[in-house]
């Protein structure tokens, strides 16, 4: 019960599922961020039948949450944010059936290359370079061990990666 309340109070307000369709293309996914790909059946509240949705989990949320003493009075117990989101994915899609899902994380090329001759303002160049690192070229894709071939192939295509860049963890 505590986990459900925590999800509804602290996590759910920050999650924005994006149903993919021509008007809503695959979103930008930051380097090494926690994300979920979800396969759905049925229509959403607007009558759309988008089969795939992406749920990006904000970095502002702690990855490990300590359960309060009233729930675990004798020892410190922690629950992972990813397991909380996994357990409540269906709450993000009312009236729809979640048929499969997978957690995923993309690693992006993060070299910072600055041309000393072209850089007039080092501070600005560094700021722009560091921002670009979050959304550089994808080089590796991690998915849950049980991720279906359909979902992993879909993600590989979105990130323009070969099969050799896929890691099941």
Stretches found by the model and what they are:
Residues 1-169:
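N-terminal non-catalytic structural scaffold regions of very large proteins
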């Amino acid at each position: 019960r505590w986990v459900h309340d925590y999800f509804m109070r602290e996590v759910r307000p920050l999650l924005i599922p994006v149903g993919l369709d021509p008007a809503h293309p695959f979103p930008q996914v930051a380097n090494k961020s926690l994300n979920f790909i979800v396969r759905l059946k049925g229509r959403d509240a607007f009558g759309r039948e988008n089969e795939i949705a992406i749920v990006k989990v904000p970095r502002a949320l702690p990855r490990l949450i300590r359960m309060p003493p009233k729930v675990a009075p004798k020892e410190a117990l922690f629950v992972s944010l990813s397991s909380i989101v996994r357990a409540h994915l269906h709450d993000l899609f009312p009236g729809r059936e979640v048929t499969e899902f997978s957690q995923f994380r993309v690693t992006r090329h993060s070299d910072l290359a600055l041309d000393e001759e072209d850089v007039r303002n080092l501070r600005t160049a560094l700021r722009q370079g560091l921002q670009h690192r979050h959304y550089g070229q994808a080089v590796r894709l991690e998915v849950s061990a049980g991720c279906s071939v359909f979902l992993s192939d879909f993600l590989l295509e979105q990130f323009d990666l070969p099969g050799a860049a896929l890691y099941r963890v």
